Amino acid sequence: MDKLDQLVQQAAAEFAAAADGVQLEQAKARYLGKTGALTERLKGLGKLAAEERRVAGAEINRAKDAIEAALEARRQALREAVLVAQLAAEALDVTLPGRGAAQGGLHPVSRTLERIEALFRSIGFVVADGPEVETDWHNFTALNTPENHPARSMHDTFYLEGHEDVLLRTHTSPVQIRTMLDHVARYGDRESMPEIRVIVPGRVYRVDSDATHSPMFHQVEGLWVGESVSFADLKGVIADFLRKFFETEELQVRFRPSFFPFTEPSAEIDVAFMSGALKGRWLEIAGCGMVHPNVLRFGGIDPERYTGFAFGMGPDRLTMLRYGVNDLRLFFEGDLRFLSQFR
């Protein structure tokens, strides 16, 4: 069986010379395929006598086992070579400085909202919430805004297509109505209802977009209703809040007469800083006023017995003033170079 030994050595040499899996399979076919050299020898066993067939068959099987072992060894070597090449291509230079995980942080408007909530919670207010998709009744009618009011125009308000009485709320004031109605449903059977003291942070929508306006922006609504709530209470709450928010006792606050359909009397709130880049300039901050009797009635509250004040301010505007940002749109563009300054 010297020829079988030579065949095994020849196959092992061809397997070792195969540079890849394709060449290895081609070499395998020459020995173990249907017309391979070893397969042909197996086919010739039928021509031998029984005793010779037994001896020759054992030798051929031994040679086949040796060839298959050489084949599998080469396959494993090729797999390892591929892995080594892959690892070399993906190798990391452990001497290079590491890249740490980027530190995240709250959005500056989120920081402002949290600060506003904390300051008002400290004086007994609770945070309320309401839907951003509102009915015309909650957004306008119940807030004493008549049907012919310009704010109802499609030029100022986003209405839902196919639903003339459904819109994206233009302010957080509808939550005033929802809060009062819920309050009356809960405490209306009592001789005297507890006070309502809520703030309503949230997103609102108007048809507007420029450096100081966005079609989506934030607003914080405030409402205090009780048996003896006055405009003096409103002035005290707002002035105290603004000085704490801007962390200065030198802040000047003034209330300028204005008009809102849902408050009477109404005022615009302006502030003036005594130092810094904005020193001496009066800047509009918020709108406020005593809740209009009609709004109290729509909320199910007797205006002959209860009074209240409401205010609305823009956290986006407050954030711009607090951090010295000149373009409101920067807050919503998602530019990490800008946002990372507020970590």
From Swiss-Prot:
**What keywords is this UniProt entry annotated with?**
Aminoacyl-tRNA synthetase, ATP-binding, Cytoplasm, Ligase, Magnesium, Metal-binding, Nucleotide-binding, Protein biosynthesis
Does the entry feature the keyword Magnesium, yes or no? yes
Keyword Ribosomal protein found: no
One GO BP: phenylalanyl-tRNA aminoacylation
Q: Where does the chain bind Mg(2+)? A: E264
Cite a single GO MF annotation. Answer: phenylalanine-tRNA ligase activity
Q: What is its EC number?
A: 6.1.1.20
Taxonomy, superkingdom: Bacteria
Q: Name where it's found.
A: Cytoplasm
A cellular component annotation (GO) from this entry: cytoplasm
Q: Which Pfam families match?
A: Phe_tRNA-synt_N, tRNA-synt_2d
Q: What reaction does this catalyse? A: tRNA(Phe) + L-phenylalanine + ATP = L-phenylalanyl-tRNA(Phe) + AMP + diphosphate + H(+)
Main localization of the protein described in the UniProt heading? cytoplasm
Cofactors per UniProt?
Answer: Mg(2+)
Sorted alphabetically, which NCBIfam families does this protein's record hold? pheS (TIGR00468)
Protein family: Belongs to the class-II aminoacyl-tRNA synthetase family. Phe-tRNA synthetase alpha subunit type 1 subfamily.
Which PANTHER family does this one have? PHENYLALANINE--TRNA LIGASE, MITOCHONDRIAL (PTHR11538:SF41), PHENYLALANYL-TRNA SYNTHETASE (PTHR11538)
Q: How does it assemble?
A: Tetramer of two alpha and two beta subunits.
The protein's name: Phenylalanine--tRNA ligase alpha subunit
- Which organism encodes this protein? Aromatoleum aromaticum (strain DSM 19018 / LMG 30748 / EbN1)
Which gene codes for it? pheS
